[in-house]
């Protein structure tokens, strides 16, 4: 999760449903950070399934690197599900997406 306030607020909401999930703070997934550094950091995480709580534009650029598809910005509060054996450039496939409604 990003250290910035909005990501921390989103994390707090997620934790109301998933109380015992480990949380890792990452200073490489803020809006203007380098997506390549973020992917490198994410590739070191020792979990089979992860949730990345961060910001545009970096999350769009992370998705671009992982899928080798053109940059596609996320909608506000959008969640996307990707499948990959390992986190590495070009090895992910988007499986689904979700935009919450009020």
Residues of each region from the PLM?
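Low-complexity, flexible helical/coil segments
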Residues: 34-39, 58-64, 86-92
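A polyampholytic, Gly/Pro-enriched intrinsically disordered region
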Residues: 42-54, 93-102
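Short, flexible active-site-adjacent loop segments at beta-strand->alpha-helix junctions, enriched
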Residues: 29, 56-58, 86, 98
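Non-DNA-binding regulatory cores of transcription-related proteins
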Residues: 44, 51, 56-78
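Domain-level recognition of soluble alpha/beta enzyme cores
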Residues: 69-93, 99
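Residue-level signal for the start and early helices of compact helical domains
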Residues: 9, 14, 20, 65, ...
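Phosphate-coordination/substrate-recognition cap region in phosphate-metabolizing enzymes
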Residues: 1-48
């Amino acid at each position: 999760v990003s250290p910035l306030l909005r990501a921390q607020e989103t994390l707090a909401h997620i934790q109301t449903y998933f109380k015992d999930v480990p949380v890792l703070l990452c200073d490489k997934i803020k809006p203007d950070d380098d997506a390549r550094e973020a992917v490198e950091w994410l590739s070191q995480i020792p979990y089979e399934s992860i949730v990345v709580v961060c910001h545009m534009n970096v999350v769009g650029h992370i998705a671009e690197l992982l899928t080798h598809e053109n940059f596609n910005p996320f909608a506000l509060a959008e969640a996307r599900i990707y499948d990959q054996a390992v986190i590495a450039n070009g090895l992910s496939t988007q499986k689904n997406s979700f935009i919450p409604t009020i």
